Amino acid sequence: MAEHSNTAIAQLAWDAVSRSDGETLGQILAPDIVWHATGNTPWRGDHNGLDAVLDYLARVGELTDVFDARLTDVLASESRVLIVFQVKVEHTGRKMELGYLVLARIEDGRAREVWTSPLDPDALARFWAH
């Protein structure tokens, strides 16, 4: 069975984020993208437009001492892609490992809207409460 085109888009986006490759992300993310970051974190909220999303993605890594994300799975359909990943975070001597989901709505080969969600929102809230 051939790889779904949205799976390839997700993998390309994952690789671009890992390399801080804004140019490639600019080809994958729609100019008017809306990114919904859920969970009780310093970067929670809606990020509107490509520049705001690129800034958000940069800030995620800047606010932590260690941010190591490992891709677990990619699931795709004609209009959506779901990325499942594990993240290890260290901040001010504290450590946490957590599963995350990224769901993207794809139109015309570009991500138009994205939602991120931690699999254990309570653990995430406790980590950032200190």
Task: Describe each region flagged by the PLM.
Residues 1-130:
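C-terminal and inter-domain tail/linker signature
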